[in-house]
Amino acid sequence: MATARGGSGPDPGSRGLLLLSFSVVLAGLCGGNSVERKIYIPLNKTAPCVRLLNATHQIGCQSSISGDTGVIHVVEKEDDLKWVLTDGPNPPYMVLLEGKLFTRDIMEKLKGETSRIAGLAVTLAKPNSTSSFSPSVQCPNDGFGIYSNSYGPEFAHCKKTLWNELGNGLAYDDFSFPIFLLEDENETKVIKQCYQDHNLGQNGSAPSFPLCAMQLFSHMHAVISTATCMRRSFIQSTFSINPEIVCDPLSDYNVWSMLKPINTSGGLEPDVRVVVAATRLDSRSFFWNVAPGAESAVASFVTQLAAAEALHKAPDVTTLPRNVMFVFFQGETFDYIGSSRMVYDMENGKFPVRLENIDSFVELGQVALRTSLELWMHTDPMSQKNESVKNQVEDLLVTLEQSGADTPQVVLSRLVQSQALPPSSLQRFLRARNISGVVLADHSGSFHNRYYQSIYDTAENINVTYPESQSPEEDLNFVTDTAKALADVATVLARALYKLAGGTNFNNSIQADPQTVTRLLYGFLVRANNSWFQSILRHDLRSYLDDGPLQHYIAVSSPTNTTYVVQYALANLTGKVTNLTQEQCQDPSKVPNESKDLYEYSWVQGPWNSNKTERLPRCVRSTVRLARALSPAFELSQWSSTEYSTWAESRWKDIQARIFLIASKELEFITLIVGFSILVFSLIVTYCINAKADVLFVAPREPGAVSY
């Protein structure tokens, strides 16, 4: 007798529930992002304040690990703070602070009421001729230059001259709540509109829910000090399969080149003399990677680039008795990272030029804000106590004065009183060896720069402006008054370097090109993504050029955009276009009379052809190279060093800002209870259905299964 066969597959009722659950999950995954977009408005153009650490402490800001949320309150005048600090009934508050109120006094008030402050969003102010803002300290790089309590104590800690007199030190404070910069005016308007629609009460009364809120994510992984975070990272990387590094040292590369090529595979002979021309590449502000640095960095390194171009055009440079080295130091803002590393490498035979090879040292400080024709020559009074050094410095000053004699737009002036050097890379070299050196700057005492190391040290700060009717290409080639003034300084510098190198025949024919200066200023301060910058870079570096200005923060990923662009700008301005093919350019060792020990070779995009249809790539041969700008403290694992910079940057998982409407605590509690009740009810229903599945869901007979 035939019988029906019993099925051994999954229970049909359970299978139905699984399919239902899968459908719900799938719908959630598909619609989750859509729901999130309807709830939150992301703020995409923001810059956070992040945590930095050194040997002794931490500075900067952070949010809690899950982000900080607060009801938005707009503070347009100081009286508006009262609502945030005492009167407002719905703390914590997310303060939308007008840029002009981002001061030490107001920040101290907010810092003292952390239980009522969830965070801060700062808008961009519009600086005027009388305003000032510098979040840096009044004595930059204090303790890491040449002056100390044991050497030149009368000059230590800026006792005689507060170089950054307007500095409020905010960038070196530690804040327990997140602080973001709102860079987009349209996003700021959206936030203010949300605030006006939902957070303004009637007749002085408290506003009703829902309220407009903001959430900021900027949780930092590192705490306490560099020594602590580096030790934790070291332990993680040693014993963990998936190590979680919590901080990284600030580092990048110095850019350097020689007037005459040298063999970089070995060191120079002791009797070879080198004149050093130096400046810095980096700046910073209170906010991460917002460092326009127009006066504090860009004007000086643009001037040096133009001077290098002018000097290389002199007909007899290959026969000069002395060589000239152009150096662009990275990380000088953070206790002289770049210069201290180069000195360390020179002392330890890791750099082709040694300290004993240095004949003289000329550094460009801040040079774009001359209030008159004067350019001041700063020297070190301590090293000049040595009679030999004093005579060498005197010769150096005389040479500079003579070089400026035929450029009436620049008057080189000596200081009338004994004064310390301003913050400068020269100080790190003087710590290692007495050399004749000078720092050229637009100030005799305190900085003229009212926005030193701030978000407002922009093109406008050094009067780089353009007619409104011009196209970007016309702006690129428009020679501004600032470009002309800096070209004059570059001419004086180039002529001085020529004379210091032993040149005599062509001094007056050396002339910096204002067109070069104006293109560089436009590219670094206004629009990096321009036709000239594109033509001088490799094809794979195009993405480094943004439609806005470049930022000059040293960071931890290197080389940075600024380093690359300066490297290639210097190579194109001072190098020679060869007829090598792309393959030969990338491997010149196979080409007769070409040497990687003497030169660097770069295959760049080149200019457009006459029809503007394709570029004409070319191989540029130059002496431009990169040298590591990582503090020796990290090479030596001396994370608590007081000799070298120990600055490190914390890592983070997510940087995010968004606004949304928030319900009252009571409604949130009710929603939670209702949701929990629904969950419990659904579990009970699911249990009951599953328990009665054999009754509710009857398995169908298999076709053809018949009993007789």
Swiss-Prot record:
<dbReference type="GO" id="GO:0042983">
    <property type="term" value="P:amyloid precursor protein biosynthetic process"/>
</dbReference>
<dbReference type="GO" id="GO:0032991">
    <property type="term" value="C:protein-containing complex"/>
</dbReference>
<dbReference type="GO" id="GO:0005769">
    <property type="term" value="C:early endosome"/>
</dbReference>
<feature type="disulfide bond">
    <location>
        <begin position="194"/>
        <end position="212"/>
    </location>
</feature>
<dbReference type="GO" id="GO:0051117">
    <property type="term" value="F:ATPase binding"/>
</dbReference>
<feature type="disulfide bond">
    <location>
        <begin position="585"/>
        <end position="619"/>
    </location>
</feature>
<dbReference type="GO" id="GO:0007220">
    <property type="term" value="P:Notch receptor processing"/>
</dbReference>
<feature type="glycosylation site" description="N-linked (GlcNAc...) asparagine">
    <location>
        <position position="611"/>
    </location>
</feature>
<dbReference type="GO" id="GO:0007215">
    <property type="term" value="P:glutamate receptor signaling pathway"/>
</dbReference>
<dbReference type="Pfam" id="PF18266">
    <property type="entry name" value="Ncstrn_small"/>
</dbReference>
<feature type="glycosylation site" description="N-linked (GlcNAc...) asparagine">
    <location>
        <position position="463"/>
    </location>
</feature>
<dbReference type="GO" id="GO:0042734">
    <property type="term" value="C:presynaptic membrane"/>
</dbReference>
<dbReference type="GO" id="GO:0005886">
    <property type="term" value="C:plasma membrane"/>
</dbReference>
<feature type="signal peptide">
    <location>
        <begin position="1"/>
        <end position="34"/>
    </location>
</feature>
<dbReference type="Pfam" id="PF05450">
    <property type="entry name" value="Nicastrin"/>
</dbReference>
<protein>
    <recommendedName>
        <fullName>Nicastrin</fullName>
    </recommendedName>
</protein>
<dbReference type="GO" id="GO:0021549">
    <property type="term" value="P:cerebellum development"/>
</dbReference>
<dbReference type="GO" id="GO:0030659">
    <property type="term" value="C:cytoplasmic vesicle membrane"/>
</dbReference>
<dbReference type="GO" id="GO:0016485">
    <property type="term" value="P:protein processing"/>
</dbReference>
<feature type="glycosylation site" description="N-linked (GlcNAc...) asparagine">
    <location>
        <position position="203"/>
    </location>
</feature>
<feature type="glycosylation site" description="N-linked (GlcNAc...) asparagine">
    <location>
        <position position="593"/>
    </location>
</feature>
<feature type="disulfide bond">
    <location>
        <begin position="229"/>
        <end position="247"/>
    </location>
</feature>
<dbReference type="GO" id="GO:1900271">
    <property type="term" value="P:regulation of long-term synaptic potentiation"/>
</dbReference>
<keyword id="KW-0914">Notch signaling pathway</keyword>
<dbReference type="GO" id="GO:0031293">
    <property type="term" value="P:membrane protein intracellular domain proteolysis"/>
</dbReference>
<dbReference type="GO" id="GO:0005764">
    <property type="term" value="C:lysosome"/>
</dbReference>
<dbReference type="InterPro" id="IPR008710">
    <property type="entry name" value="Nicastrin"/>
</dbReference>
<dbReference type="GO" id="GO:0042500">
    <property type="term" value="F:aspartic endopeptidase activity, intramembrane cleaving"/>
</dbReference>
<keyword id="KW-0732">Signal</keyword>
<keyword id="KW-0968">Cytoplasmic vesicle</keyword>
<dbReference type="GO" id="GO:1990926">
    <property type="term" value="P:short-term synaptic potentiation"/>
</dbReference>
<feature type="glycosylation site" description="N-linked (GlcNAc...) asparagine">
    <location>
        <position position="579"/>
    </location>
</feature>
<dbReference type="GO" id="GO:0034205">
    <property type="term" value="P:amyloid-beta formation"/>
</dbReference>
<feature type="glycosylation site" description="N-linked (GlcNAc...) asparagine">
    <location>
        <position position="186"/>
    </location>
</feature>
<keyword id="KW-0472">Membrane</keyword>
<dbReference type="GO" id="GO:0071277">
    <property type="term" value="P:cellular response to calcium ion"/>
</dbReference>
<dbReference type="GO" id="GO:0005783">
    <property type="term" value="C:endoplasmic reticulum"/>
</dbReference>
<dbReference type="GO" id="GO:0008021">
    <property type="term" value="C:synaptic vesicle"/>
</dbReference>
<feature type="topological domain" description="Cytoplasmic">
    <location>
        <begin position="690"/>
        <end position="708"/>
    </location>
</feature>
<dbReference type="GO" id="GO:0042982">
    <property type="term" value="P:amyloid precursor protein metabolic process"/>
</dbReference>
<feature type="glycosylation site" description="N-linked (GlcNAc...) asparagine">
    <location>
        <position position="386"/>
    </location>
</feature>
<dbReference type="GO" id="GO:0050673">
    <property type="term" value="P:epithelial cell proliferation"/>
</dbReference>
